C-alpha cells in the first residue's frame, strides 16, 4: 500500500466520521460544508499488504473559530500502528468561503490516546508482494517545508485529468503526492514514500496545466512545489528512505 493510497484512505474515513450523527455535523456536511485540509504530517511506520484487517482511529485535538486540528492512526486489527497523521483543516461553507465551526464540534475535543501500539513485527514473507514483512520505523512527524526553490530543480508539466479530481472537482492531497512520486520516478529516485509534510495552498482542476517542481533537500528527503503559473498550489517534503 503506497503513501498516496494511505492519504486517500484517511481522507475517506474523515468524511465518514464527519457524517456520523454522533458528532453532530451531519446536517452541515449534507448541506455542503466541510473541512478543507491545510496541512498534514503523515508517516507510515510499517509496510502493510493486502488482506490485513485494519481500522482508522481519529480524534479531534483543537477547535478554533474556523480551523480545527486532529490526529489519525491506521492500526492493524491487533492494535499495532501502521501509519500516523496529524491534520489541520479549515471549515468551509458551500460557497467556498471560511465559515464558523458549529459549536457542537467543541464537545468532541479530546486529549485521549488513540490506543495504537508499536508492537512486534509481523513475520510476513520477504518475497511476497501481498504479505510483506513489517519492519518497524519511528513514524516521526518532523519534516519541514522548504520554501526556496533551487534554480536547478527538476520540472515536469502535468495536465490534470478529470479522473484526478474528487467529488469537489479539485485535486486532493493524495493525488498531489502521487504527482510528486511520479516525478521522482522520472528522475530515477525512489517513488516509494513513507513520510511527508504537506501544505495544501490551492485547488487544481481538470484541464489545468500544472508544473511539478522537485529537488533533493536531504539524504533521503525531497521537496516539491506544485504550481499553476506563478501560483503555488501545494508544497511538500517527502522521505524516500525504504521501509
Label for each model-derived stretch:
Residues 43-143, 200, 204-209, 215-243:
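HotDog/MaoC-like acyl-thioester-processing domains
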Amino acid at each position: 500500500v503506497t503513501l498516496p493510497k494511505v492519504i486517500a484512505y484517511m481522507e475517506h474515513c474523515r468524511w465518514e466520521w464527519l457524517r456520523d450523527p454522533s458528532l453532530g455535523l451531519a446536517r452541515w456536511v449534507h448541506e455542503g460544508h466541510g473541512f478543507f485540509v491545510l496541512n498534514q504530517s503523515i508517516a507510515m511506520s510499517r509496510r502493510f499488504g493486502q488482506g490485513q484487517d485494519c481500522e482508522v482511529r481519529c480524534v479531534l485535538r483543537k477547535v478554533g473559530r474556523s480551523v480545527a486540528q486532529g490526529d489519525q492512526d491506521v492500526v492493524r486489527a491487533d492494535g499495532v500502528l501502521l501509519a500516523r497523521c496529524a491534520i489541520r483543516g479549515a471549515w468551509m461553507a458551500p460557497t467556498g468561503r471560511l465559515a464558523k465551526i458549529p459549536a457542537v464540534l467543541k464537545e468532541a475535543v479530546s486529549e485521549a490516546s488513540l490506543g495504537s501500539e508499536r508492537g512486534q513485527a509481523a513475520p510476513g514473507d520477504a518475497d511476497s508482494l501481498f504479505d510483506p514483512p513489517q519492519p518497524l520505523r519511528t513514524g516521526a512527524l518532523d519534516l519541514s517545508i522548504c520554501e526556496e526553490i533551487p534554480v536547478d530543480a527538476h520540472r515536469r508539466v502535468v495536465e490534470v485529468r478529470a479522473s484526478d479530481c474528487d467529488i469537489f472537482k479539485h485535486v486532493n492531497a493524495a493525488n498531489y503526492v502521487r504527482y510528486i512520486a511520479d516525478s521522482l520516478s522520472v528522475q530515477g529516485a525512489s517513488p516509494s514514500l513513507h513520510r511527508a509534510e504537506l501544505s495544501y495552498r490551492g485547488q487544481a482542476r481538470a484541464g489545468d496545466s500544472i508544473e511539478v517542481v522537485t529537488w533533493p533537500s536531504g539524504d533521503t528527503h525531497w521537496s516539491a512545489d506544485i504550481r499553476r503559473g506563478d501560483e503555488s498550489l501545494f508544497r511538500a517534503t517527502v522521505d524516500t528512505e525504504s521501509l
